[in-house]
A protein has these predicted regions:
Chain A
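ABC ATPase nucleotide-binding domains
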Residues: 34, 75-235
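The feature captures the beta-strand-to-loop junction immediately N-terminal to the Walker
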Residues: 38-40
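Helix-to-loop junction immediately C-terminal to a conserved catalytic motif
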Residues: 53
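Conserved post-Walker A/P-loop segment of ABC ATPase nucleotide-binding domains
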Residues: 56-64
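ATP-binding/catalytic-site motifs of ATP-hydrolyzing domains
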Residues: 62, 68, 214
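Non-catalytic connector elements of ABC transporters
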Residues: 240, 250-375
Length: 375, 274
């Protein structure tokens, strides 16, 4: 990386007895970026974050923060601060004392401390809330106090463990944007843990996707969406139709494939995929498919389909369609342009797709079993 | 509950009678302690505070009161400290044998006092500890630990472990975390535990009778006085005071326990400047 590295994990592993919660984690974070660790519950995100914070010591590997090896430095002497999932607001202290808690040992005068506290509260738009009791705060306000309490310490890295999961949907969406704006304005590196793909995508510069203690891919949200390196990443981020394919020719930047149901297409090579093989797998995002009553013009491939089911989402409509030669039901997402649902269950329709929309997912690992199941 | 009530229409009456039977005699105690007569019988003759006044002059009574305070205070501190460790472990950690160990800690609540008392006497004599105040303190600690554990467990139940982590993360030392976060939040629970265990020890008779030797605690002293009919009114007065004092302590303890449960500890951090 050309930009300055702030956190460097190399070969970090955490074992609890026989369970390996985090496995061989290599990660470099850049100063000032908003980084998210994304993955299903139980995949080891929190454990990874807690090792960066210093609450847990890695079983092996090293952690460097700003060039210094902190692997054995306890949490109270690391230049990181954490926003807890439960916010952990001290119930016996008012907002001002909560936010000023960590300045106690800073050697600052009372006046300076008070200035820092009010500055931090301004930052999270809670200016003047110093004398509020902790139990008079709403969930969103507690979240802001927790943020201010961590930011007042001016950490090199702010760690957030599922910071928005306790908020209701509207507040959560508003806070996503606000947290992002805050991070950009203060320029501190944020590392957030979340299991919510949308949260990770809307907020982060880069996302690390984790499964079973293993970091599978680190990329920008756009790259993860357009060029996922594995089937599990493709499946976890956004919707995806998976199609088996045969790879005929891999010349240069394109792969000549015979895709189940859709026929021959030249698909762009996905640089994030580890290996290719004759049995290949491709993916098509639901919104990249066109559905029409008549054969649509100008597409690289068109096929007939039957509408098996319909789901109305308001802003979009999902058609679940069956295509001859495609083993699984496919999903087509159509924006709700004119408040009309154009197809009924059981109707026949046409699908159109561009080769540029087809994502190369490399060797198809469960091709063998699928062949076996075929009747 | 509704169905149960339909099945047993007399349940309410039964409950009322039960409570009356249980508590009316207790209420008679203070009533007769103000009576001029020396025998406990209706009708009550006149009103006097003499029996109370005479209490202040009884030397042995004051000594036994002092003994009880020493025993109660030591017991309260010991069992609360033990309870603190146990409760924290039970709430915070999942370890092998946790449930069995919890059951054993609670056992003194259901073992008959006379059995505990006689076996302790045997054990202490075997160990060379003669009946004395320290022996009573040990016995009472054993008896009151379950109270301390259950009160402190409810205090820890409400305590989010992330609070201590947050304080540590903000640069506090382990001791600082305990002083600035754990203590203020658990504090009311600790006070409640101290008060309850003190009260239980203060009122306990059987163990004290077996283990106190020649330094009686207050209940043992009262028992010794009941043999003298002339002293009965004084004993009633003393008993009434004891009753009032215990109720007061338990109410205070309950107040603190609730405060602990709702996290309404100390309001302000001391703003010490350096
Ligand atoms: N202190 C611990 N002791 C034993 N196992 C743990 C401990 N902390 C986490 N685990 C286990 O490690 C795995 C990963 O947990 P965690 O990091 O909390 O996952 P996530 O945050 O992604 O949901 C889980 O299987 C969890 O049960
Ligand atoms: Mg987690």
């Amino acid at each position: 990386m050309t930009a300055e590295t702030i956190i460097e994990l190399s070969g970090v592993e955490k074992r609890f007895g026989t369970l390996t919660a985090v496995r061989d984690l290599d990660l470099e974070l850049v100063k000032g970026e908003f980084f998210s660790l994304l993955g299903p519950s139980g995949c080891g995100k929190t454990t990874a974050l807690r090792m960066i914070a210093g609450f847990q010591e890695p079983s092996s590997g090293t952690i460097r923060i700003d060039g210094e090896d902190v692997s054995t430095v306890p949490a109270n002497r690391r230049p990181t601060n954490m926003v807890f999932q439960s916010y952990a607001i001290f119930p016996h202290l008012d907002v001002g004392d909560n936010v000023g808690f960590g300045l106690h040992r800073s050697g600052l005068s009372r006046k300076e401390r008070r200035a820092r506290v009010s500055e931090a509260l301004e930052l999270v738009e809670l200016g003047g809330y110093e004398r509020r009791r902790a139990n008079q705060l709403s969930g969103g306000q507690q979240q802001r106090v927790a943020l201010a309490r961590a930011l007042v310490m001016r950490p090199k890295v702010l760690l957030l463990d599922e910071p928005l999961s306790a908020l209701d949907k509207n507040l959560r969406e508003a806070m996503q944007l606000e947290l992002r704006r805050l991070q950009q304005s203060i320029g501190i590196t944020f590392v957030m843990v979340t299991h919510d793909q949308y949260e990770a995508m809307t907020m982060s510069d880069r996302i690390g996707v984790m499964f079973n203690g293993q970091l599978e891919q680190v990329d920008t949200p756009q790259t993860l969406y357009a060029s996922p390196g594995t089937r599990s990443v493709a499946n976890f981020i956004g919707g995806m139709n998976f199609l088996p394919a045969r790879l005929h020719n891999e010349g240069g930047g394109t792969l000549d494939m015979e895709i189940a149901g859709f026929g021959a297409m030249a698909v762009g090579r996905n640089p994030n995929v580890a290996d290719h093989g004759r049995n290949a797998l491709v993916g098509i995002r639901p919104e990249q498919l066109e559905i029409a009553a008549h054969r649509p013009e100008g597409y690289d491939s068109t096929v007939q389909c039957r509408v098996a089911d319909i789901a109305f989402y308001g802003e979009s409509i999902h058609y679940f369609v069956e295509v001859d030669g495609v083993p699984e039901t496919m999903t087509v997402a159509v924006p709700n342009y004119f408040h009309s649902v154009d197809f009924t269950r059981g109707a026949t329709a046409w699908l159109g797709v561009q080769a540029a929309s087809v994502i190369d997912l490399g060797r198809n690992r469960d091709n063998e079993t699928q062949q076996g199941e075929k009747t | 509950m509704k169905r149960l009530r339909r099945l047993l229409p007399g349940l309410g009456t039964y409950a009322a009678l039960y409570l009356a039977f249980l508590y009316l005699p207790v209420l008679l105690l203070p009533l007769f302690s103000f009576s001029e007569g020396t025998i406990v019988a209706f009708p009550i003759k006149g009103f006097t505070l003499d029996w109370y006044a005479q209490l202040g002059e009884a030397d042995t009574l004051l000594h036994s009161l002092a003994n009880s305070v020493i025993v109660g205070g030591s017991t309260a501190v010991l069992s609360t400290v033990l309870g603190l460790f146990a409760a924290r472990a039970y709430v915070r950690h999942r370890f092998f044998g946790r449930e069995i160990s919890e059951g054993i800690v609670m056992l003194p609540l259901v073992i008959p006092g006379i059995i505990v008392a006689s076996s302790m006497l045997v054990l202490f004599l075997f160990l060379g500890l003669r009946p004395s105040l320290p022996a009573v303190i040990l016995g009472h600690t054993f008896l009151t630990v379950p109270f301390a554990v259950s009160i402190l467990k409810s205090a820890f139940d409400e305590f989010d472990p992330a609070l201590e982590e947050a304080a540590y993360d903000l640069g506090e030392t382990t001791i600082g975390v305990f002083r600035r976060v754990t203590m203020p939040i658990i504090g009311p629970g600790i006070v409640s535990s101290l008060l309850v265990t003190f009260t239980v020890s203060f009122d306990e008779f059987v163990l004290a009778f077996f283990l106190s030797g020649n330094r009686p605690t207050l209940p043992v002293y009262i028992w010794s006085q009941i043999r003298f009919p002339a002293k009965l009114p004084n004993t009633l007065a003393l008993g009434s005071l004891l009753l009032a004092f215990s109720v007061l302590l338990l109410l205070t303890a309950e107040y603190f326990r609730r405060r602990a449960a709702t996290g309404q500890g100390a309001r302000k951090e001391s703003r010490d400047d350096r």
